[in-house]
Amino acid sequence: MQVLVNHPSHSRQLGPPASADNPLDFSMVDVRLPMLVYVSREKRPGFNHEKKAGAMNALTRCSAVLTNSPFILNLDCDHYINDSQALRAGICFMLGRDSDTVAFVQFPQRFEGVDPTDLYANHNRIFFDGTLRALDGMQGPIYVGTGCLFRRVTLYGFDPPRINVGGPCFPSLGGMFAKARYEKPGLEMTTKAAVAKGKHGFLPLPRKAYGKSEAFVDSIPRASHPSPFAAGAAVVADEATISEAVAVTTAAYEKKTGWGSNIGWVYGTVTEDVVTGYRMHIKGWRSRYCSIYPHAFIGTAPINLTERLYQVLRWSTGSLEIFFSRNNPLFGSTFLHPLQRVAYINITTYPFTAIFLIFYTTVPALSFVTGHFIVQRPTTMFYVYLAIVLGTLLILAVLEVKWAGVTVFEWFRNGQFWMTASCSAYLAAVC
Protein backbone atom coordinates (compact mmCIF):
# COMPACT_ATOMS: atom_id res chain seq x y z
CA MET A 1 0.00 0.00 0.00
CA GLN A 2 1.27 3.44 -0.89
CA VAL A 3 -0.28 6.77 0.10
CA LEU A 4 0.34 8.97 -2.95
CA VAL A 5 -1.64 11.98 -1.69
CA ASN A 6 -2.52 12.41 1.99
CA HIS A 7 -5.65 14.02 3.42
CA PRO A 8 -6.06 17.64 2.25
CA SER A 9 -6.10 20.46 4.77
CA HIS A 10 -9.38 21.96 5.99
CA SER A 11 -8.54 25.43 4.67
CA ARG A 12 -8.60 26.42 1.02
CA GLN A 13 -5.38 26.36 -0.97
CA LEU A 14 -5.43 28.75 -3.92
CA GLY A 15 -3.25 28.14 -6.93
CA PRO A 16 -0.56 30.39 -8.39
CA PRO A 17 -1.48 33.44 -10.46
CA ALA A 18 -0.69 33.77 -14.13
CA SER A 19 2.94 34.34 -15.03
CA ALA A 20 5.25 34.37 -18.02
CA ASP A 21 5.90 30.64 -17.63
CA ASN A 22 2.27 29.75 -16.87
CA PRO A 23 -0.39 31.87 -18.62
CA LEU A 24 -3.23 30.15 -16.73
CA ASP A 25 -4.53 31.98 -13.66
CA PHE A 26 -5.32 29.67 -10.71
CA SER A 27 -5.36 32.38 -8.05
CA MET A 28 -9.11 31.86 -7.44
CA VAL A 29 -9.08 28.06 -7.80
CA ASP A 30 -8.90 25.66 -4.86
CA VAL A 31 -6.12 23.25 -5.87
CA ARG A 32 -6.46 20.78 -2.99
CA LEU A 33 -6.51 17.13 -4.07
CA PRO A 34 -8.38 14.31 -2.31
CA MET A 35 -6.52 11.47 -0.65
CA LEU A 36 -5.08 8.99 -3.16
CA VAL A 37 -3.94 5.53 -2.06
CA TYR A 38 -2.68 2.66 -4.22
CA VAL A 39 -3.59 -0.76 -2.82
CA SER A 40 -2.30 -4.15 -3.95
CA ARG A 41 -3.99 -6.80 -1.84
CA GLU A 42 -2.29 -9.97 -0.67
CA LYS A 43 -2.85 -13.23 -2.56
CA ARG A 44 -1.44 -16.49 -1.28
CA PRO A 45 -1.90 -20.23 -1.95
CA GLY A 46 -4.70 -21.84 0.03
CA PHE A 47 -6.93 -18.76 -0.03
CA ASN A 48 -9.43 -18.01 -2.77
CA HIS A 49 -8.97 -14.35 -3.70
CA GLU A 50 -12.51 -14.26 -5.26
CA LYS A 51 -11.36 -12.09 -8.16
CA LYS A 52 -13.19 -8.77 -8.54
CA ALA A 53 -15.62 -9.31 -5.66
CA GLY A 54 -12.74 -10.04 -3.28
CA ALA A 55 -10.85 -6.98 -4.47
CA MET A 56 -13.87 -4.72 -3.93
CA ASN A 57 -14.43 -6.08 -0.42
CA ALA A 58 -10.77 -5.51 0.45
CA LEU A 59 -10.95 -1.93 -0.83
CA THR A 60 -14.16 -1.35 1.13
CA ARG A 61 -12.46 -2.30 4.40
CA CYS A 62 -9.29 -0.41 3.55
CA SER A 63 -11.14 2.81 2.70
CA ALA A 64 -13.19 2.51 5.91
CA VAL A 65 -10.00 2.56 7.98
CA LEU A 66 -8.47 5.46 6.04
CA THR A 67 -11.44 7.75 5.32
CA ASN A 68 -14.78 6.04 6.10
CA SER A 69 -16.36 8.11 3.35
CA PRO A 70 -20.15 7.68 3.05
CA PHE A 71 -20.10 6.82 -0.68
CA ILE A 72 -18.09 4.36 -2.79
CA LEU A 73 -17.65 4.62 -6.56
CA ASN A 74 -17.04 1.40 -8.48
CA LEU A 75 -15.31 1.65 -11.87
CA ASP A 76 -13.77 -1.19 -13.87
CA CYS A 77 -10.14 -0.93 -14.92
CA ASP A 78 -11.15 -0.31 -18.54
CA HIS A 79 -13.34 2.70 -17.66
CA TYR A 80 -12.44 6.30 -16.92
CA ILE A 81 -14.25 9.41 -15.68
CA ASN A 82 -15.37 11.49 -18.65
CA ASP A 83 -17.31 14.22 -16.81
CA SER A 84 -15.94 15.82 -13.64
CA GLN A 85 -19.52 16.52 -12.48
CA ALA A 86 -20.49 12.83 -12.52
CA LEU A 87 -20.00 12.29 -8.79
CA ARG A 88 -22.02 15.39 -7.94
CA ALA A 89 -24.88 14.13 -10.12
CA GLY A 90 -24.84 10.74 -8.39
CA ILE A 91 -24.61 12.13 -4.87
CA CYS A 92 -27.66 14.32 -5.52
CA PHE A 93 -29.73 11.12 -5.60
CA MET A 94 -28.24 10.13 -2.23
CA LEU A 95 -28.92 13.45 -0.49
CA GLY A 96 -32.26 14.47 -1.97
CA ARG A 97 -35.69 14.22 -0.44
CA ASP A 98 -36.64 10.68 0.66
CA SER A 99 -33.24 9.47 -0.53
CA ASP A 100 -32.23 7.63 2.65
CA THR A 101 -33.46 4.36 1.14
CA VAL A 102 -31.31 4.67 -2.02
CA ALA A 103 -28.57 2.03 -1.93
CA PHE A 104 -26.78 2.84 -5.18
CA VAL A 105 -26.92 5.01 -8.27
CA GLN A 106 -26.26 3.24 -11.57
CA PHE A 107 -24.90 5.13 -14.59
CA PRO A 108 -25.36 3.70 -18.10
CA GLN A 109 -22.26 2.24 -19.72
CA ARG A 110 -20.77 4.09 -22.68
CA PHE A 111 -17.97 2.78 -24.87
CA GLU A 112 -15.31 4.08 -27.23
CA GLY A 113 -13.49 2.22 -29.97
CA VAL A 114 -16.72 0.77 -31.39
CA ASP A 115 -16.95 0.39 -35.16
CA PRO A 116 -19.35 2.87 -36.84
CA THR A 117 -21.95 0.19 -37.58
CA ASP A 118 -21.71 -1.33 -34.07
CA LEU A 119 -21.64 -4.80 -35.59
CA TYR A 120 -21.50 -6.58 -32.21
CA ALA A 121 -24.05 -4.35 -30.41
CA ASN A 122 -21.48 -3.10 -27.90
CA HIS A 123 -23.42 0.06 -27.13
CA ASN A 124 -26.49 -2.03 -26.23
CA ARG A 125 -28.57 1.10 -25.73
CA ILE A 126 -31.82 -0.85 -25.69
CA PHE A 127 -30.69 -2.25 -22.33
CA PHE A 128 -28.85 0.73 -20.84
CA ASP A 129 -31.21 3.48 -22.03
CA GLY A 130 -34.42 1.47 -22.19
CA THR A 131 -34.51 -1.36 -19.67
CA LEU A 132 -32.51 0.31 -16.88
CA ARG A 133 -34.44 3.55 -17.24
CA ALA A 134 -37.74 1.64 -17.09
CA LEU A 135 -36.65 -0.11 -13.89
CA ASP A 136 -36.11 3.32 -12.35
CA GLY A 137 -39.88 3.52 -12.03
CA MET A 138 -39.91 0.55 -9.62
CA GLN A 139 -37.13 -0.23 -7.15
CA GLY A 140 -34.51 0.93 -9.59
CA PRO A 141 -32.00 -0.44 -12.09
CA ILE A 142 -29.89 -3.50 -11.43
CA TYR A 143 -26.21 -3.17 -10.59
CA VAL A 144 -24.23 -3.88 -13.78
CA GLY A 145 -20.73 -4.03 -12.30
CA THR A 146 -19.25 -0.63 -13.14
CA GLY A 147 -20.21 3.03 -13.16
CA CYS A 148 -22.05 2.65 -9.86
CA LEU A 149 -22.07 4.85 -6.75
CA PHE A 150 -22.85 2.99 -3.50
CA ARG A 151 -23.98 4.11 -0.08
CA ARG A 152 -21.37 2.51 2.19
CA VAL A 153 -23.72 1.18 4.88
CA THR A 154 -25.65 -0.90 2.35
CA LEU A 155 -22.52 -3.04 1.89
CA TYR A 156 -22.41 -3.78 5.63
CA GLY A 157 -25.73 -5.62 5.77
CA PHE A 158 -27.87 -2.76 7.09
CA ASP A 159 -31.59 -2.67 6.35
CA PRO A 160 -33.13 0.52 4.95
CA PRO A 161 -34.56 2.91 7.56
CA ARG A 162 -38.02 2.35 6.07
CA ILE A 163 -39.52 0.31 3.28
CA ASN A 164 -41.76 1.63 0.52
CA VAL A 165 -41.25 -0.42 -2.64
CA GLY A 166 -44.87 -0.75 -3.71
CA GLY A 167 -46.87 1.43 -6.02
CA PRO A 168 -50.54 2.30 -6.46
CA CYS A 169 -51.03 -0.46 -9.05
CA PHE A 170 -48.61 -3.09 -7.74
CA PRO A 171 -48.21 -2.72 -3.97
CA SER A 172 -45.48 -4.82 -2.42
CA LEU A 173 -46.49 -7.62 -0.10
CA GLY A 174 -43.63 -6.49 2.10
CA GLY A 175 -45.54 -3.33 2.92
CA MET A 176 -47.94 -5.39 5.02
CA PHE A 177 -45.11 -6.60 7.24
CA ALA A 178 -42.75 -3.63 7.13
CA LYS A 179 -44.31 -1.86 10.10
CA ALA A 180 -44.16 -4.91 12.33
CA ARG A 181 -40.59 -5.63 11.28
CA TYR A 182 -39.26 -2.15 11.92
CA GLU A 183 -41.05 -1.63 15.21
CA LYS A 184 -39.01 -4.38 16.84
CA PRO A 185 -36.88 -3.00 19.70
CA GLY A 186 -33.38 -2.05 18.66
CA LEU A 187 -33.77 -1.94 14.90
CA GLU A 188 -34.10 1.85 14.82
CA MET A 189 -30.63 2.01 16.34
CA THR A 190 -29.22 1.95 12.82
CA THR A 191 -29.31 5.77 12.84
CA LYS A 192 -29.10 8.18 15.77
CA ALA A 193 -29.01 5.58 18.54
CA ALA A 194 -26.04 3.87 16.92
CA VAL A 195 -24.01 7.06 17.10
CA ALA A 196 -25.21 7.76 20.63
CA LYS A 197 -23.85 4.42 21.79
CA GLY A 198 -20.39 5.41 20.62
CA LYS A 199 -17.86 3.25 18.88
CA HIS A 200 -19.49 0.03 20.12
CA GLY A 201 -22.88 0.99 18.68
CA PHE A 202 -25.43 -1.10 16.86
CA LEU A 203 -24.30 -3.57 14.21
CA PRO A 204 -26.73 -5.50 11.99
CA LEU A 205 -24.56 -8.63 12.34
CA PRO A 206 -22.29 -9.99 15.10
CA ARG A 207 -18.93 -8.23 15.39
CA LYS A 208 -17.02 -11.36 14.43
CA ALA A 209 -18.82 -11.39 11.06
CA TYR A 210 -16.89 -8.26 10.07
CA GLY A 211 -13.46 -9.59 11.00
CA LYS A 212 -10.94 -9.03 13.76
CA SER A 213 -9.99 -5.43 13.01
CA GLU A 214 -11.27 -3.22 15.84
CA ALA A 215 -10.56 -0.07 13.82
CA PHE A 216 -12.70 -1.28 10.95
CA VAL A 217 -15.57 -2.59 13.08
CA ASP A 218 -15.65 0.63 15.09
CA SER A 219 -16.02 2.63 11.86
CA ILE A 220 -19.30 0.91 10.94
CA PRO A 221 -21.62 2.71 13.43
CA ARG A 222 -20.12 6.03 12.34
CA ALA A 223 -20.85 5.15 8.71
CA SER A 224 -24.52 4.64 9.61
CA HIS A 225 -24.85 8.21 10.91
CA PRO A 226 -28.06 9.90 9.65
CA SER A 227 -25.92 12.72 8.27
CA PRO A 228 -23.72 10.96 5.67
CA PHE A 229 -20.75 13.31 5.71
CA ALA A 230 -20.45 13.03 9.50
CA ALA A 231 -19.05 9.54 8.93
CA GLY A 232 -15.99 10.60 7.00
CA ALA A 233 -13.88 11.95 9.81
CA ALA A 234 -10.38 12.26 8.35
CA VAL A 235 -7.67 10.39 10.20
CA VAL A 236 -3.96 10.97 10.00
CA ALA A 237 -2.41 8.44 7.65
CA ASP A 238 0.38 7.56 10.07
CA GLU A 239 2.24 4.28 10.31
CA ALA A 240 -0.30 2.69 12.67
CA THR A 241 -3.23 3.57 10.40
CA ILE A 242 -1.44 2.27 7.32
CA SER A 243 -0.61 -0.98 9.13
CA GLU A 244 -4.27 -1.42 10.08
CA ALA A 245 -5.36 -0.73 6.50
CA VAL A 246 -2.90 -3.33 5.23
CA ALA A 247 -4.14 -5.86 7.79
CA VAL A 248 -7.74 -5.70 6.57
CA THR A 249 -6.63 -6.50 2.99
CA THR A 250 -4.71 -9.68 3.84
CA ALA A 251 -5.78 -12.98 2.33
CA ALA A 252 -6.68 -14.53 5.69
CA TYR A 253 -8.79 -11.64 7.01
CA GLU A 254 -12.11 -12.94 5.64
CA LYS A 255 -11.70 -16.43 7.10
CA LYS A 256 -14.76 -17.34 9.23
CA THR A 257 -16.46 -14.00 8.57
CA GLY A 258 -19.57 -12.88 6.72
CA TRP A 259 -17.71 -11.27 3.84
CA GLY A 260 -18.96 -12.52 0.50
CA SER A 261 -22.20 -13.91 1.94
CA ASN A 262 -23.97 -11.34 4.13
CA ILE A 263 -21.50 -8.47 3.83
CA GLY A 264 -20.03 -6.71 0.81
CA TRP A 265 -19.86 -8.05 -2.73
CA VAL A 266 -21.27 -11.57 -2.96
CA TYR A 267 -19.02 -14.54 -3.80
CA GLY A 268 -19.81 -17.74 -5.63
CA THR A 269 -20.81 -16.43 -9.06
CA VAL A 270 -19.11 -14.80 -12.02
CA THR A 271 -21.83 -12.12 -12.04
CA GLU A 272 -21.30 -10.88 -8.51
CA ASP A 273 -22.65 -7.50 -9.55
CA VAL A 274 -26.21 -8.69 -10.23
CA VAL A 275 -26.36 -10.74 -7.02
CA THR A 276 -24.98 -7.92 -4.88
CA GLY A 277 -27.60 -5.49 -6.17
CA TYR A 278 -30.30 -8.14 -5.85
CA ARG A 279 -29.44 -8.73 -2.18
CA MET A 280 -29.94 -5.02 -1.53
CA HIS A 281 -33.25 -4.89 -3.39
CA ILE A 282 -34.76 -7.83 -1.51
CA LYS A 283 -34.08 -5.98 1.75
CA GLY A 284 -36.15 -3.06 0.52
CA TRP A 285 -33.35 -0.78 -0.64
CA ARG A 286 -33.89 1.19 -3.86
CA SER A 287 -31.53 2.22 -6.64
CA ARG A 288 -31.56 5.10 -9.08
CA TYR A 289 -30.67 5.56 -12.76
CA CYS A 290 -28.53 8.58 -13.65
CA SER A 291 -27.74 9.52 -17.25
CA ILE A 292 -25.95 12.81 -17.91
CA TYR A 293 -24.23 14.48 -20.82
CA PRO A 294 -21.30 14.58 -21.36
CA HIS A 295 -21.29 10.89 -20.50
CA ALA A 296 -20.20 10.24 -16.93
CA PHE A 297 -17.89 7.29 -17.62
CA ILE A 298 -16.50 5.74 -20.79
CA GLY A 299 -15.08 2.26 -21.22
CA THR A 300 -13.35 0.13 -23.84
CA ALA A 301 -15.50 -2.30 -25.83
CA PRO A 302 -14.47 -5.73 -27.20
CA ILE A 303 -12.90 -5.27 -30.62
CA ASN A 304 -13.76 -8.61 -32.25
CA LEU A 305 -16.50 -11.24 -32.24
CA THR A 306 -14.49 -13.75 -30.18
CA GLU A 307 -14.01 -11.35 -27.26
CA ARG A 308 -17.61 -10.17 -27.45
CA LEU A 309 -19.04 -13.71 -27.40
CA TYR A 310 -16.73 -14.67 -24.53
CA GLN A 311 -18.06 -11.67 -22.61
CA VAL A 312 -21.65 -12.72 -23.30
CA LEU A 313 -20.83 -16.33 -22.34
CA ARG A 314 -19.53 -15.18 -18.96
CA TRP A 315 -22.65 -13.09 -18.32
CA SER A 316 -25.06 -15.84 -19.36
CA THR A 317 -23.20 -18.43 -17.28
CA GLY A 318 -23.47 -16.15 -14.27
CA SER A 319 -27.19 -15.67 -14.87
CA LEU A 320 -27.75 -19.43 -14.83
CA GLU A 321 -25.66 -19.73 -11.65
CA ILE A 322 -28.03 -17.27 -10.00
CA PHE A 323 -31.10 -19.12 -11.26
CA PHE A 324 -29.91 -22.43 -9.78
CA SER A 325 -28.84 -20.93 -6.45
CA ARG A 326 -30.53 -19.65 -3.33
CA ASN A 327 -30.51 -16.20 -4.93
CA ASN A 328 -33.20 -17.23 -7.41
CA PRO A 329 -35.58 -14.23 -7.65
CA LEU A 330 -38.57 -16.59 -7.68
CA PHE A 331 -38.02 -17.13 -3.96
CA GLY A 332 -36.83 -13.66 -2.99
CA SER A 333 -38.10 -11.54 -0.12
CA THR A 334 -41.58 -10.05 -0.19
CA PHE A 335 -39.91 -6.63 -0.01
CA LEU A 336 -39.10 -6.99 -3.71
CA HIS A 337 -41.42 -5.04 -6.00
CA PRO A 338 -43.51 -7.48 -8.13
CA LEU A 339 -42.31 -6.00 -11.42
CA GLN A 340 -38.77 -5.81 -10.09
CA ARG A 341 -38.99 -9.54 -9.44
CA VAL A 342 -40.09 -10.09 -13.04
CA ALA A 343 -37.06 -8.10 -14.21
CA TYR A 344 -34.68 -10.23 -12.14
CA ILE A 345 -36.36 -13.42 -13.38
CA ASN A 346 -35.79 -12.22 -16.94
CA ILE A 347 -32.13 -11.53 -16.17
CA THR A 348 -31.57 -15.03 -14.79
CA THR A 349 -33.52 -16.97 -17.44
CA TYR A 350 -32.69 -15.26 -20.74
CA PRO A 351 -30.01 -17.87 -21.71
CA PHE A 352 -32.79 -20.49 -21.91
CA THR A 353 -34.11 -18.72 -25.01
CA ALA A 354 -31.33 -20.52 -26.90
CA ILE A 355 -33.19 -23.83 -26.51
CA PHE A 356 -36.40 -22.53 -28.09
CA LEU A 357 -34.59 -20.62 -30.82
CA ILE A 358 -32.55 -23.68 -31.85
CA PHE A 359 -35.71 -25.80 -31.78
CA TYR A 360 -37.70 -23.46 -34.00
CA THR A 361 -34.85 -23.06 -36.49
CA THR A 362 -33.94 -26.75 -36.84
CA VAL A 363 -37.23 -28.66 -36.57
CA PRO A 364 -38.81 -27.16 -39.74
CA ALA A 365 -35.70 -28.21 -41.66
CA LEU A 366 -36.47 -31.83 -40.81
CA SER A 367 -39.35 -31.61 -43.28
CA PHE A 368 -36.81 -31.77 -46.10
CA VAL A 369 -35.35 -34.99 -44.65
CA THR A 370 -38.61 -36.79 -43.83
CA GLY A 371 -40.63 -35.48 -46.75
CA HIS A 372 -43.51 -34.62 -44.41
CA PHE A 373 -44.56 -31.17 -43.24
CA ILE A 374 -44.26 -31.40 -39.46
CA VAL A 375 -46.28 -28.28 -38.64
CA GLN A 376 -50.01 -28.77 -38.99
CA ARG A 377 -52.05 -26.78 -41.50
CA PRO A 378 -52.80 -23.28 -40.12
CA THR A 379 -56.35 -22.50 -39.03
CA THR A 380 -58.19 -19.22 -38.83
CA MET A 381 -57.52 -18.93 -35.08
CA PHE A 382 -53.84 -19.52 -35.75
CA TYR A 383 -53.75 -16.47 -38.00
CA VAL A 384 -55.59 -14.46 -35.35
CA TYR A 385 -53.05 -15.41 -32.67
CA LEU A 386 -50.20 -14.77 -35.09
CA ALA A 387 -51.53 -11.29 -35.86
CA ILE A 388 -51.84 -10.51 -32.14
CA VAL A 389 -48.28 -11.69 -31.42
CA LEU A 390 -46.79 -9.83 -34.37
CA GLY A 391 -48.73 -6.69 -33.47
CA THR A 392 -47.48 -6.87 -29.89
CA LEU A 393 -43.88 -7.32 -31.04
CA LEU A 394 -44.24 -4.37 -33.40
CA ILE A 395 -45.57 -2.15 -30.61
CA LEU A 396 -42.71 -3.24 -28.32
CA ALA A 397 -40.18 -2.45 -31.05
CA VAL A 398 -41.63 1.03 -31.57
CA LEU A 399 -41.61 1.71 -27.82
CA GLU A 400 -38.02 0.46 -27.47
CA VAL A 401 -36.88 2.78 -30.26
CA LYS A 402 -38.75 5.70 -28.70
CA TRP A 403 -37.82 5.17 -25.04
CA ALA A 404 -34.18 4.25 -25.64
CA GLY A 405 -33.73 7.07 -28.14
CA VAL A 406 -32.08 4.84 -30.75
CA THR A 407 -32.44 4.61 -34.49
CA VAL A 408 -34.16 1.74 -36.26
CA PHE A 409 -30.75 0.58 -37.51
CA GLU A 410 -29.37 0.45 -33.94
CA TRP A 411 -32.45 -1.51 -32.86
CA PHE A 412 -31.87 -3.93 -35.75
CA ARG A 413 -28.21 -4.41 -34.79
CA ASN A 414 -29.26 -5.20 -31.24
CA GLY A 415 -31.69 -7.88 -32.43
CA GLN A 416 -29.18 -9.22 -34.92
CA PHE A 417 -26.54 -9.80 -32.26
CA TRP A 418 -29.15 -11.34 -29.96
CA MET A 419 -29.71 -14.00 -32.63
CA THR A 420 -25.96 -14.57 -32.90
CA ALA A 421 -25.49 -14.85 -29.13
CA SER A 422 -28.53 -17.11 -28.70
CA CYS A 423 -27.16 -19.65 -31.17
CA SER A 424 -23.67 -19.63 -29.64
CA ALA A 425 -22.88 -18.14 -26.21
CA TYR A 426 -26.33 -18.68 -24.67
CA LEU A 427 -26.43 -22.27 -25.91
CA ALA A 428 -22.93 -22.96 -24.58
CA ALA A 429 -23.91 -21.60 -21.17
CA VAL A 430 -27.02 -23.79 -21.01
CA CYS A 431 -25.17 -26.91 -22.13
Please describe what each predicted stretch is:
Residues 100, 303-311, 315:
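Carboxylate/His-rich catalytic cores and anion/metal-binding grooves
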Residues 290:
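The conserved SAM/SAH-binding core of class I Rossmann-like methyltransferase domains
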